[in-house]
Amino acid sequence: MDLRQIQYFIALFEDGSVTRAAKRLNIVQPALSMQIAKLETELRQQLFERGPHGMTPTDAARQMYRLYTPIMRDIDRARDQLSRQDAIVTGRVSLGMVSSEAESVLPESLARFNALFPQVEVSVADGFSAQLIDAVEAGRLDAAVINKPRGRLALDVVPLLDEEMVLVTSAALGPDLPPAIDLATLTGIELVLPTRRNGLRGVLDAALLAADVVIKPKFEIDLLNTIVQFVEQSAVATILPRVVVQRKVDESVLRARTIASPPIVRHIILVSHPKRPIGPAARALIDIIGEEIRRVTTGTPAA
């Protein structure tokens, strides 16, 4: 497998058509088809279902796309950095993140960032959204990735992504439930949720209030890892962002079910001080974090 094959695969995955992908790559269609067939042979996996309406990616293709697209973005970013006269970026980045995002994507994000910017020092703090807002306002953090609060902010705000919250149960011990859940009719299920000082609980409560739905958790815990482990080992369910549990869902340890009614979506935003612009290193780290969140939750990196 070489970089050219990966580029061809990504183009075909995104365009869904040999004709469109070949045009995008500026190559002839037989050359593209030959490289994809060669790639499938090397991997011993069928990557696309051929049909009259185009190329439909298989599960193997979706997994490959999730794994390789961030790598190609890093290569493009590194090439861009090296082509500039000011390629060596130095300094220090101080970033805050809500723990639900930090625990899920930060290790991979920092590894990618360090490979691109080895001379930049990084400090990351986690906490509740309100705490991180205070730290940005006081100048202790360059920026923070938080849950969007209900009130207005005196900081610069950049929307990063919208993420669904899902009902999570143990794959081995959890109750047998339909793939889509109506919380208004959910009965006989014990719930563990974050406490009310947690921004995730605020998102959940706001959605329930708007839909006139009432649920009462039996347990309230702020440590997300503890919530996840508790759910793994019991018949208790929880409601959390998909990014928090997706890996364990992929490993068939947990099950995540869509909440059809009321839909619960949290809005992730970036906040920074209007008098302290974000530098290029901080911006690069934030972009990588956004890509990792999309990769984990949907397989679609940030644009």
Task: Give each language-model segment a name.
Residues 88-153, 221-223:
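Central regulatory/effector-binding core of bacterial HTH transcription factors
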Residues 40-57:
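A short LG(V/I)-centered, amphipathic sequence patch enriched
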Residues 128-133, 137-141, 146-147, 197-257:
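Hydrophobic hinge/microswitch elements
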Residues 10-28:
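Short helix-boundary/capping micro-motifs
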Residues 152-191:
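Flexible hinge/capping segments at coil-to-helix
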Residues 105, 257-299:
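A late-sequence structural motif
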Residues 96, 165, 181-200, 290-294:
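Short loop->beta-strand "edge-of-pocket" segments that line small-molecule binding or catalytic clefts
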Residues 10, 42-43, 63-86, 296:
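Alpha-helical linker/hinge and terminal dimerization helices associated
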